[in-house]
From Swiss-Prot:
It holds the Pfam family HAGH_C. This is Hydroxyacylglutathione hydrolase. Its EC number is 3.1.2.6. The keyword Transport does not apply. Zn(2+) 1 binds at residues 52, 54, 109, 126. Its cofactor is Zn(2+). It comes from Stenotrophomonas maltophilia (strain K279a).
Length: 254
């Protein structure tokens, strides 16, 4: 089994798991072209997994359905994804390529956002990024906190496969919030070196994210202190920290 991140648009990744026989699971194909280029070399798409309804994640589905009639399209319970052939929610499982993809409900970025994880990988869409998380378009800080806590219980060895190359820009904000975090400094330097060489900063272990990502560490004293200082008052609880942290990030300029 081979994991490939297909670049799309300015900074998207279309994650593709490819079996030895060329059969594939494709995650969030906002653009069909990168997948169709592999199809011209023999790739056969068996299953498409969709994390949420935004067009840069689902826009390529009709063209892939035309190329691969009968392909499964698994999506959240969401009326804004009309191309879905199956809909799943929290605790359900998808079987594909001999692997089990566990479904997690992770609202925040959108109200119906889901993630998929196997024994090796977490496909988080726009819920969790390396060193960051998705902007709140439809969800609440309380929902975002619950989603981050849920992702924070996953095995540390899982590889985070998120949908955007935001690591370097996220690192600047994370360092501003948590400047004494040595692991974060190291992750930033590694990410900068990777991007200078035009390499992806992903996947990355959840263990690294647990150490470095401020949105997974709202309970930690340094994060709480930074958010309190930014707000000019003591934070009340973890929801207050998450709300302040997300709002801070939304308006942050390095």
């Amino acid at each position: 089994m081979r994991l490939t991140a297909l670049p799309a648009f300015a900074d998207n990744y279309i994650w593709t798991l490819i079996a030895d026989d060329g059969t594939a699971v494709v995650v969030d194909p906002g653009d069909a072209a990168p997948v169709l280029a592999l199809a011209d070399q023999g790739l056969r798409v068996d299953t498409i997994l969709l994390t949420h309804h935004h067009d840069d994640h689902i826009g390529g589905v009709p063209a892939l359905q035309a190329r691969f009639p009968g392909v499964r399209v698994i999506a959240p319970v969401e009326e804004r994804i009309p191309t879905a052939t199956g809909r799943v929610g929290e605790g359900e499982r998808v079987q594909a390529l001999g692997r089990t993809f566990h479904v997690l409900s992770v609202p925040g970025h959108t109200r119906s956002h889901i993630a998929f994880h196997t024994a090796e990988h977490l496909f988080s869409g726009d819920s969790l990024f390396s060193l960051g998380c998705g902007r709140l378009f439809e969800g609440t800080p309380s929902q975002l906190l619950a989603s981050m806590r849920k992702l924070g219980t996953l095995p540390a060895q899982l590889l985070l496969c998120c949908a955007h190359e935001y690591t370097v820009s996220n690192a600047v904000f994370a360092r501003h919030v948590d400047p004494a975090n040595a692991a974060l400094w190291q992750r930033q330097e590694e990410a900068l070196a990777m991007r200078r060489d035009d390499r992806s900063t992903l996947p990355v272990t959840l263990a690294n994210e647990f150490d470095c990502n401020p949105f997974l560490r709202v309970h930690a004293a340094p994060i709480r202190a930074s958010v309190s200082a930014h707000l000019g008052r003591d934070v009340v609880d973890d929801v207050d920290v998450m709300a302040g942290l997300r709002h801070w990030k939304d308006g942050f300029r390095a």
